[in-house]
A protein has these predicted regions:
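Polar, enzyme-active/binding microenvironments
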Residues: 1-100
Length: 100
C-alpha cells in the first residue's frame, strides 16, 4: 500500500488515503489522523506500520506529535508519543528495524 495523509484542501485536513501499488486506481479512504495538520516531518515505515511526526496546524505553529497506523487494516491514526521539539517539513528514514 501507498499512504497519503493530511494536507490542505482548501483547509487543513486529517484525511488518510491509500492506494494499492500493485494495481492502477484512485486513492481510497483509510481513516483519519489524530488531528488535522500539514507539512509533517516526513514518514517512516516497516512492513507493518507507518509513523509520521510533527507538522503544522492552522493557524498555530509546528507541533511535536507522533502518530502511527497499521498497513494491514484501515483505521484511524493512534498516538505514538511526542518529538523532543515541535517541527515540520523535516525528513525521516527507516529500515526494517527502526527509524531516524
Amino acid at each position: 500500500r501507498g499512504v497519503f495523509a493530511g494536507g490542505w484542501s482548501p483547509n487543513v485536513v486529517n484525511i488518510i488515503d491509500y492506494i494499492t501499488t500493485a494495481t492502477l486506481g484512485n486513492a481510497v479512504d483509510f481513516g483519519d489522523m489524530t488531528e488535522a495538520k500539514y507539512s509533517m516531518s516526513g514518514s517512516m515505515s516497516s512492513k507493518t506500520r507507518m509513523v509520521i511526526g510533527g507538522g503544522h496546524r492552522n493557524p498555530s505553529p509546528a507541533v511535536n506529535t507522533i502518530e502511527y497506523w497499521e498497513f494491514a487494516t484501515t483505521g484511524n491514526g493512534t498516538d505514538f508519543g511526542d518529538l523532543s521539539a515541535a517541527k515540520s517539513s523535516g525528513g525521516q528514514c527507516s529500515n526494517a528495524h527502526g527509524g531516524l
